[in-house]
A protein has these predicted regions:
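Short conserved loop adjoining the S-adenosyl-L-methionine
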Residues: 2-8
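Local beta-strand N-terminus motif with an aromatic residue
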Residues: 10-12
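A conserved beta-strand element that flanks and buttresses the S-adenosyl-L-methionine
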Residues: 15-18
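A short, conserved alpha-helix within the catalytic core of class I
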Residues: 23-36
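Conserved Class I S-adenosyl-L-methionine
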Residues: 57-93
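A C-terminal cap/extension of S-adenosyl-L-methionine-dependent methyltransferases
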Residues: 92-138
Length: 138
């Protein structure tokens, strides 16, 4: 994910699930988002899920085995994709929800059988999807 071969091009679909937050830094994750679009044919679609800091202390977790992206980070990445590759990206849905599953935050050692939100250090995290398509060829 840090060194995508340049000959991997022309694909209709690129997908990752909870992966690019493990590249070691916010910057590395955002670079992956930009680089992965080169793999797509014009009109190809990408879907990536990642960790999203949805609460807790100010700031975020960066330069670690898992990083937590903020809304500002995700919007920056989306802006670069739109500008560089004319990507059409679905709007982010960052609604927290009000149901019991939405409001429950699991804490280490994560005993709950299922959860939507985790306490990671000083922050609350959940998963968010980035969905888009590549525009013109570059």
């Amino acid at each position: 994910m840090r060194a995508i071969p340049t000959d991997l091009t022309g694909f209709d679909f690129v997908y990752s699930s909870c992966a690019f937050e493990h590249l070691g830094s916010i910057a590395a994750g955002l670079q992956f988002l930009v680089d992965q679009v080169r793999c797509l044919a014009p009109g190809g679609v990408f879907i990536h899920t990642t960790e999203f800091r949805c609460g807790g202390a100010p700031g975020t977790l960066d330069h670690a085995g898992t990083v937590l992206f903020t809304e500002a980070h995700l919007r920056l990445g989306m802006a670069v994709l739109r500008e560089k590759y004319s990507c059409n990206i679905l709007p982010l849905d960052l609604a927290s929800g009000e149901d019991a599953w939405d409001t429950y935050v699991d804490h280490p050692p994560y005993q709950q059988d299922g959860h939507l939100k985790l306490q990671i250090g000083n922050w609350v995290s959940t998963s968010v999807a980035l969905i888009g398509g590549r525009g013109h060829a570059q």
